[in-house]
Amino acid sequence: VLRALRIPLLVVFVSALTGVGLFPSWVAAQARAACVLVGMLEPPLLAGALRLATREPVLEDRPIAGVPSVVARPAGDGPWPTIVFANGATPEGRHHPVVLRLARGFARAGFVVYVPELPGLRVGEVAPESLEATIGVARAAADVARGGRVGLVGVSTGGSLALRAAQDPALHGRVSGVSAVAPYTDIRNVFQLATTGTYREGEDVRAYEPAEGYLALVAARSLARLLPEGPDRERMSTALRAVSDTDPDPLAVLD
């Protein structure tokens, strides 16, 4: 789920990442962070100055490790430092306007950015295939990245996938850093909170209201995907997919 505040926070996190991990020069890191901020926020005067001072990045839509992806890269020859961006659950997926502006901003700052269409996220479902695709794209990106490593960046659900992917043995030694904004770090607690409006604190169960309606819908759709294959799973998944993302009581369909 994208929120207006999360993307600026993401840039702050990635600014720190670039400063400590990808560039030896602190000043260069701050200049690149400014490129990303201006490219994403597009303030009128500064955006024009950025376009004059930097070359237009190249954006293309192509499969990476079998996953449809937007790839943004700087003009000119590489290799470049590389980022894999894991989006949150949004119907616009990899073509979300804010995400595309962010990718262009990173490309103007000298990064190659991969924005994969992770399976399930466009319809609010997080499944094992979502993680497998994150890992697969990161491996493919690292194969051609400068230094053979990539930075993993994610927002919301994508942040959780980025954190989990970085732990996978297939990416051992191939991740330069991870930056996650508003990730879900305890999936069991998230599902409990989303579906019941309660959470555990030690041995106690405490109420937490209001639980975000869309979070409950994502949790329910994701849990339905994990049920054994069969007509019951199909009926539940179909019913949940028919619920509007803005429904304040999305689980009423299960009553």
List PLM regions with ranges.
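Conserved alpha/beta-hydrolase "nucleophile elbow" surrounding the catalytic nucleophile
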Residues: 153-159, 181
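N-terminal Sec-pathway targeting helices
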Residues: 1-14
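Short beta-strand element of the alpha/beta-hydrolase
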Residues: 79-88
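Alpha/beta-hydrolase-fold enzymes
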Residues: 23-24, 164-255
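Membrane-interface motif at the C-terminal end of an N-terminal transmembrane signal
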Residues: 15-33
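Catalytic nucleophile-loop/oxyanion-hole region of alpha/beta-hydrolase
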Residues: 94-102, 109, 114-151, 161, ...
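N-terminal cap/lid segment of alpha/beta-hydrolase-fold proteins
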Residues: 30-78
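Structural recognition of the beta-strand scaffold that forms the well-ordered cores
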Residues: 84-85, 113-116, 151, 177-180
